[in-house]
């Protein structure tokens, strides 16, 4: 039976401010990426999210981003050196590892967030710095990378275990990059459309661009953003469609 991982970005509230329905999304995901305090999240939210994931048998990963709470980590931060990027990534991974130990759970993977990921997909220095930080913290951590990107090449060069990611609810350009969130249609919202799209991604090993071009991509994990309106309904629809197609859902990290 074909198996695929479903991952969600969670723990992205801050203090009294909540983002998304983490408890519901954890019931539908097999892996979650937890904000580590820079673009969102705090120690209490991190621990609560880890506890929910452990109770649900869901793998957890660090979701490091630029230090930009106001912009939710979706704005590039210019002028950072490779060492500064390594520091901010290692800092955030370590924070989640420490909090996870309180809940008796283990961090299995790392996925860069927002603008940090977007920049790294096109900039070798940023991509290599992220990979170097992960390797320095724990060379066994799985590096979640966007297919056909510089992040992928950096992870390969560093010798890290990799999980190739595609996005259920994001549109793709013909060059396999994500359509900018500033453009209309960048984020998809129709649960039925997204569910059918994910099944095709897994079965065909390809995504369809905004112009209708089929782009071959290895697919180890499919991301559904927890902050997308209707995220729970989207995730539920994807799970149901995968089941109907005979595709099992399981963590890429092996549980």
Curated annotation (Swiss-Prot):
CDD domains: LamB_YcsF_like (cd10787). NCBIfam families: PRK05406.1-3 (NF003814), PRK05406.1-5 (NF003816). It is an enzyme of class 3 (hydrolase). SUPFAM superfamilies: Glycoside hydrolase/deacetylase (SSF88713). This is 5-oxoprolinase subunit A. GO terms for biological process: carbohydrate metabolic process. The lineage of its organism: Bacteria, Pseudomonadati, Pseudomonadota, Alphaproteobacteria, Hyphomicrobiales. Catalyzes the cleavage of 5-oxoproline to form L-glutamate coupled to the hydrolysis of ATP to ADP and inorganic phosphate. It catalyses: 5-oxo-L-proline + ATP + 2 H2O = L-glutamate + ADP + phosphate + H(+). Forms a complex composed of PxpA, PxpB and PxpC. Keywords: ATP-binding, Hydrolase, Nucleotide-binding. HAMAP family: PxpA. GO terms for molecular function: 5-oxoprolinase (ATP-hydrolyzing) activity; ATP binding. It holds the Pfam family LamB_YcsF. InterPro entries: Glyco_hydro/deAcase_b/a-brl, LamB/YcsF/PxpA-like. Belongs to the LamB/PxpA family. Its EC number is 3.5.2.9.
